[in-house]
């Protein structure tokens, strides 16, 4: 049984192409989820958001396309394609789509 699901194995793929932005929505695709790690691909339509919450583990965001605004413990960070942001465990954080954007979220 594979640990990573919902994506082809042993193929070179464009990661951003594995999910589509849908108007007025936040779309997600989970690649891995267990007690130790989660890996989820997100596509945000401009203006959409995930409200403030916290996480049991450190969260690493890798922005694939577009620009997202992340608020971590009250500090705002504007991240564009190619940027990485670490959101430490237990710190409140939120995400806002400054424009259509895609990101990979890994929580450990």
Please place each PLM-identified region on the residue numbering.
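A short, N-terminal "cap"/entry segment at the start of jelly-roll beta-barrel domains
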Residues: 1-36, 71
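Conserved short histidine dyad/triad with adjacent acidic residue
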Residues: 24-25, 38-55, 89
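Short, surface-exposed secondary-structure edge patches
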Residues: 41, 60, 75-77
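Glycine- and acidic-residue-biased ligand/ion/polar-headgroup-sensing regions
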Residues: 57-69
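A cytosolic small-molecule/anion-sensing beta-strand core signal
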Residues: 64-65, 80-81, 99
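Short acidic-glycine-tyrosine-enriched beta hairpin
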Residues: 74-89
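Ligand-binding loop in jelly-roll beta-barrel domains
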Residues: 89-108
């Amino acid at each position: 049984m594979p640990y990573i699901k919902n994506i082809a194995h042993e193929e070179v793929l464009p990661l951003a192409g594995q999910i589509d932005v849908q108007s007025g929505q936040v779309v997600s695709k989970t690649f891995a989820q267990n007690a130790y790690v989660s890996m989820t691909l997100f596509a945000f339509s401009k203006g959409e958001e995930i409200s403030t919450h916290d996480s049991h583990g450190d969260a690493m965001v890798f922005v694939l396309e577009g620009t997202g605004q992340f608020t971590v413990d009250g500090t705002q960070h504007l991240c564009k394609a190619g940027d990485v942001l670490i959101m430490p465990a237990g710190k409140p954080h939120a995400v806002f789509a400054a424009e259509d954007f895609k990101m990979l979220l890994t929580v450990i």
